[in-house]
């Protein structure tokens, strides 16, 4: 009795198309004599050729063929093959630090429009402090998402990369302390209490957004908090700090400043919204009810399209009413192709987690370019 077991592994492509693809070859333990003829027999064929010279009758027992699919394993394998350098780049989130640069630069440009002053040293101090605050937001977000399980399979999570929750949290708290120290020191030098209160409000928004016991991002309030923190609070505070001098301690809060801060908050919130497209299933599993979890990706793509339209409609209205200087409006409309790119990309790929991951980076590009255009327009209007 001869036993045959065939294991087919789809991963390596060894899959028999039909029964005649499987053959049995008789094992030979001695040199064949002149009369022996060895043939290959199909396992299942009813018309199997027989050894004409062999008198004994051989019985074949065929066992089932087990075929395994490695579709899921292939995905895991692909994830494991992502270079560590690329994972570190994702963890650093360097493009995301534009959310520190844009409010500061727009605020500085608005202050220059009002006063004709640019305080370079104060600008650099505020920039470094803002970067430290964003670092705290990123690190603490990874820590608390690790605690809830939201980042369990997120390979670019800082906690997963370094393997230490405690170390990551310590780095986050250190960044927060240094960043707040820089902001307070600058505010005290400028003798501007309003700026201190606005910056404190912005940081408070960041805390209740992700830190326990609040974690308001899990209730779908992340986007409004992001809008307030980086728009009216941070942008206006930077305007006040960078326009304060020995001659002018208190700047007026004009419509140009407030409208500019609204635009900054608008595009910052869009980044946060689009960053959740590829995380819908994971967020839902841990009870994180972001707007995209509630809406679904198809309705989310619809929201992105109309958000882009609303953004440029606001620009048009602000330009026609002369709330924003004409150079600002013209410069900002040059970014319209990037806005269309964000809208079309999300609409096309919102169901593809592999591609929609890039949507937030297109939003970062729009945010940075619109901020640069807005800043340049304010400077030109001077």
Curated annotation (Swiss-Prot):
GO molecular function, one term: 1,4-dihydroxy-2-naphthoate polyprenyltransferase activity
Annotated keywords: Chloroplast, Membrane, Plastid, Transferase, Transit peptide, Transmembrane, Transmembrane helix
Membrane topology qualifier: Multi-pass membrane protein
GO CC terms in record: chloroplast; chloroplast membrane
Domain of life assignment: Eukaryota
GO biological process: photosynthetic electron transport in photosystem II; phylloquinone biosynthetic process; plastoquinone biosynthetic process
Cross-referenced InterPro entries: DHNA_phytyltransferase_MenA, UbiA_prenyltransferase, UBIAD1
Record field: catalytic activity: 2-carboxy-1,4-naphthoquinone + phytyl diphosphate + H(+) = demethylphylloquinone + CO2 + diphosphate
Transit peptide, UniProt annotation: 1-66
Disruption of the gene: reported phenotype: Slower growth and dwarfism. Albino phenotype in aging leaves. Decreased number of chloroplasts, but normal lamellar structure retained. Absence of phylloquinone and 97% decrease in the content of plastoquinone.
Enzyme Commission number(s) from the entry: 2.5.1.130
Residues passing through the membrane, by range: 99-119, 123-143, 168-188, 196-216, 224-244, 257-277, 323-343, 361-381
EC main group: transferase
NCBIfam families (UniProt xref): menA_cyano-plnt
Family statement: Belongs to the MenA family. Type 2 subfamily.
UniProt protein name: 2-carboxy-1,4-naphthoquinone phytyltransferase, chloroplastic
Lineage: Eukaryota, Viridiplantae, Streptophyta, Embryophyta, Tracheophyta
This protein's encoding gene: ABC4
């Amino acid at each position: 009795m001869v036993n045959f077991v065939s294991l087919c592994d789809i991963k390596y492509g060894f899959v028999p198309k039909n029964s005649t693809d499987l053959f049995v070859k008789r094992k030979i333990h001695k040199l064949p004599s002149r009369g022996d003829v060895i043939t290959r027999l199909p396992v299942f064929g009813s018309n199997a050729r027989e050894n004409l010279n062999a008198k004994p009758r051989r019985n074949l027992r065929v066992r089932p063929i087990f075929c395994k699919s490695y579709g899921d394993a292939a995905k895991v394998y692909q994830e494991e093959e992502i270079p560590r350098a690329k994972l570190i780049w994702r963890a650093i989130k360097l493009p995301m630090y534009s959310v520190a640069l844009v409010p500061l630069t727009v605020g500085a440009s608005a202050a220059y429009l009002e006063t004709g002053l640019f305080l370079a040293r104060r600008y650099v101090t505020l920039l470094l402090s803002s970067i430290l605050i964003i670092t705290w937001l990123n690190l603490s977000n990874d820590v608390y998402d690790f605690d809830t399980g939201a980042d369990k399979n997120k390979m670019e999570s800082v906690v997963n990369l370094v393997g230490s929750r405690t170390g990551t949290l310590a780095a986050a708290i250190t960044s927060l302390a240094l960043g707040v120290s820089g902001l307070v020191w600058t505010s005290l030098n400028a003798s501007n209490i309003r700026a201190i209160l606005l910056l404190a409000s912005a940081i408070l928004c960041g805390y209740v957004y992700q830190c326990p016991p609040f974690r308001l991002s899990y209730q779908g309030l992340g986007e409004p908090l992001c809008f307030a923190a980086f728009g009216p609070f941070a942008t206006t505070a930077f305007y006040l700090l960078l326009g304060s001098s020995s001659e002018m301690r208190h700047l007026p809060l004009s419509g140009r400043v407030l409208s500019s801060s609204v635009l900054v908050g608008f595009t910052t919130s869009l980044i946060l919204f689009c960053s959740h497209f590829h995380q819908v299933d994971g967020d839902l599993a841990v009870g994180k009810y972001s707007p995209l979890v509630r809406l679904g990706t198809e309705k989310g793509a619809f929201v992105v399209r109309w958000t882009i339209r609303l953004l440029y409609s606001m620009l048009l209205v602000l330009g026609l009413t002369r709330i924003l200087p004409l150079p600002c409006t013209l410069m900002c409309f040059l970014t319209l192709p990037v806005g269309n790119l964000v809208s079309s990309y999300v609409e096309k790929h919102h169901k593809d987690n592999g591609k929609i991951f890039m949507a937030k980076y297109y939003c970062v590009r729009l945010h940075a370019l619109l901020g640069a255009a807005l800043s340049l327009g304010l400077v030109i209007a001077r």
